[in-house]
């Protein structure tokens, strides 16, 4: 049985009470249906039983992938620093109790839903999220030169077998376009930049485009 909490929230449309389920953690192996609801966005959606208006409400939780040895803490941007401290503390306590079992894990903190889905897909397909973030910067530059992306759009990359799929999303106007990307860009990024990864520091880290841009800037200054 899955552990969840029931919250009573007020419908923003009619003011009626709505019961809303939240989960403290999701295990991709034991809760595959919850994982599917997460990736589809259904996990955060609700329908008011009174006016039948539908809404969306996120909540923090821990995503646990025991197969690929991944722990991802999802939180809001406003609580990122606070959550990071708590996350680090909880992992340290778990290591004291369970010992070497957690040594093989990678730990990530994510404060944006699109990035969470991208990371789950990344690890499910055996990719390295550090390489993928660098690849996104390279792909983003190419798309900018072709006028296929602008400053209001976000880029996400997904493994699609023989190529990468670029999802370009504009949250302001709720639009998305998809573009095929040559997978060789990822392979080149892995070949050229993996040597600069600090394996110990990036075992537990916030890996995003900001992290990748900082790393590329350091590399350019060295060279």
Regions found by a protein language model. Give the residues of each.
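Short acidic DE-rich linear segments
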Residues: 3-4, 211-223
């Amino acid at each position: 049985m899955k552990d969840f909490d029931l919250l009573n929230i007020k419908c923003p449309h009619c003011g009626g009470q709505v019961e809303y389920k939240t989960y403290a953690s999701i295990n991709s192996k034991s809760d595959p249906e919850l994982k599917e609801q997460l990736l589809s966005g259904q996990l955060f959606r609700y329908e008011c039983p009174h006016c039948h208006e539908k809404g969306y409400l996120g909540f923090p939780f821990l995503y646990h992938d025991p197969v690929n040895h991944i722990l991802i803490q999802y939180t809001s941007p406003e609580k990122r620093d606070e959550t990071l401290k708590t996350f680090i503390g909880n992992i340290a306590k778990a290591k004291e109790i369970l010992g070497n079992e957690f040594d093989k894990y990678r730990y990530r903190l994510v404060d944006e839903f699109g990035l969470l889905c991208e990371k789950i897909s990344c690890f499910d397909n055996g990719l390295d999220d550090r390489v993928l973030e660098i690849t996104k910067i390279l792909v983003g530059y190419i798309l900018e030169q072709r006028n296929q992306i602008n400053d209001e759009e976000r880029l996400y990359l997904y493994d699609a077998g023989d190529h990468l799929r670029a999802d370009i999303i504009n949250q302001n106007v709720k639009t998305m376009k998809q573009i095929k990307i040559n997978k060789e860009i990822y392979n080149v990024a892995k070949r050229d930049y993996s040597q600069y990864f600090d394996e110990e520091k990036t075992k537990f880290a916030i890996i995003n485009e900001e992290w990748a841009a900082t790393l590329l800037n350091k590399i350019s200054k060295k060279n």
